[in-house]
C-alpha cells in the first residue's frame, strides 16, 4: 500500500477532507501488532479496506502496509513514536486488533482512552486477550469478538458509521 496508490493528497487525508468536497470523514487510528508479529497482516489490510469503503480516513495506514518493516527500519525509535502519537492525537477513534499481544497496541489503547477517544478492540475467539482490555470498564472502550472476515468487516463498518 504505497503512498502513490492512495487517493487524494496526504494532507487532506490527515485533515479528514474528502477530495475537494470539504466533507468531513471520521479519522481512524488503526492499531495492530508490528514487532510482536505480523501474522495478521491480511486482517489489518481488510480492516483498512473496510474503513476506507465506509468513508473513514485511516491515518495510520502504515499498519496495513506489507513494506512497513523496511520503511520503519529507516526511522529512529523517536520518529516512529512521534509519528504514531501525532496521528493518534488527530484521530476521532482508534480501532485495534488485539489477537496478537503487543505492548505498543496496549500503549496506544491507553493513550486513546486517556484522551477520551473512542476505542474498538477486536479479537478472534481463541485469543488470550489481556484482562487490562477485557476487564476495563471505560465507557469509551468497546471489545468485540469476530469469527470470520465477514463479521470483522460488519463490526468495523458499524463502528465507523456510528462516529
UniProtKB/Swiss-Prot annotation:
GO molecular function: 5-hydroxymethyl-dUMP N-hydrolase activity
EC number: 3.2.2.-
Cited SUPFAM superfamilies: N-(deoxy)ribosyltransferase-like
Keyword Signal: no
Residues reported to bind substrate: 29-35, 44, 62, 108, 130-132
One of the protein's GO biological processes: nucleoside metabolic process
Keywords from the UniProt entry: Glycosidase, Hydrolase, Nucleotide metabolism
Known catalytic reactions: a pyrimidine 2'-deoxyribonucleoside 5'-phosphate + H2O = a pyrimidine nucleobase + 2-deoxy-D-ribose 5-phosphate; a purine 2'-deoxyribonucleoside 5'-phosphate + H2O = a purine nucleobase + 2-deoxy-D-ribose 5-phosphate
Coiled-coil boundaries: none
Segments traversing the membrane: none
InterPro entries according to UniProt: 2'-dNMP_N-hydrolase, DNPH1, Nucleoside_deoxyribTrfase
Classification via PANTHER family: 2'-DEOXYNUCLEOSIDE 5'-PHOSPHATE N-HYDROLASE 1 (PTHR15364:SF0)
Subunit and interaction comment: Monomer and homodimer.
Function: Catalyzes the cleavage of the N-glycosidic bond of deoxyribonucleoside 5'-monophosphates to yield deoxyribose 5-phosphate and a purine or pyrimidine base.
Family listed: Belongs to the 2'-deoxynucleoside 5'-phosphate N-hydrolase 1 family.
Annotated protein name in UniProt: Putative 2'-deoxynucleoside 5'-phosphate N-hydrolase 1
Organism whose genome encodes this protein: Methanosarcina acetivorans (strain ATCC 35395 / DSM 2834 / JCM 12185 / C2A)
